[in-house]
């Protein structure tokens, strides 16, 4: 399961980020896209895009994909810059606010790294899904990164 978001130049609200209202899902060899993207379509992906843009306004595209350790190994082998966060370190006041975790985790990872990396991941937590976020300047460079990850991963699992 994944989603994709892209922020307008100088985006600062949910409605400035286009995303899919429902997740993109792999079904066998097919990919199901249950709806067309729209501005304000995904609060979760928009929170990540907007937080990233606060640190580097040129990075406007994000795709989240389900975490697994082999994907992290692939990202390392591709020499993608990476940062992570541990949801156990999340302050309680953030944890109880719906939607605040993604902003906190994204900002935490970027601050720890010192710049916006290609990849931000976490291993989840109680009722929190583990996730990898691929970050890029635009949709084309995002697609390029994701396809490289997919191609290398496909060779790994054959």
Protein language model regions, located:
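Conserved mixed alpha/beta catalytic, RNA-binding, or beta-rich assembly cores of soluble enzyme
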Residues: 1-158
């Amino acid at each position: 399961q994944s989603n994709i978001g892209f922020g307008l130049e100088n985006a600062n609200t949910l409605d400035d980020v286009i995303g899919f209202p429902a997740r993109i899902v792999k079904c066998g060899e097919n990919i199901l896209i249950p709806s067309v993207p729209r501005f304000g379509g995904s609060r979760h992906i928009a929170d990540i895009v907007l937080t990233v843009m606060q640190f580097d306004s040129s990075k406007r595209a994000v795709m989240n994909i389900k975490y697994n350790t082999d994907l992290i190994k692939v990202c390392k082998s591709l020499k993608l810059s990476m940062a992570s966060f541990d949801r156990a370190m999340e302050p309680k006041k953030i944890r109880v606010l719906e939607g605040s975790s993604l902003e906190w985790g994204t900002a935490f990872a970027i601050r720890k790294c010192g710049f916006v990396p290609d990849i931000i991941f976490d291993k989840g937590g109680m009722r929190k899904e583990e996730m990898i976020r691929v970050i890029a300047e635009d949709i084309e460079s995002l697609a390029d990164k994701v396809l490289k990850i997919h191609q290398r991963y496909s060779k790994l699992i054959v």
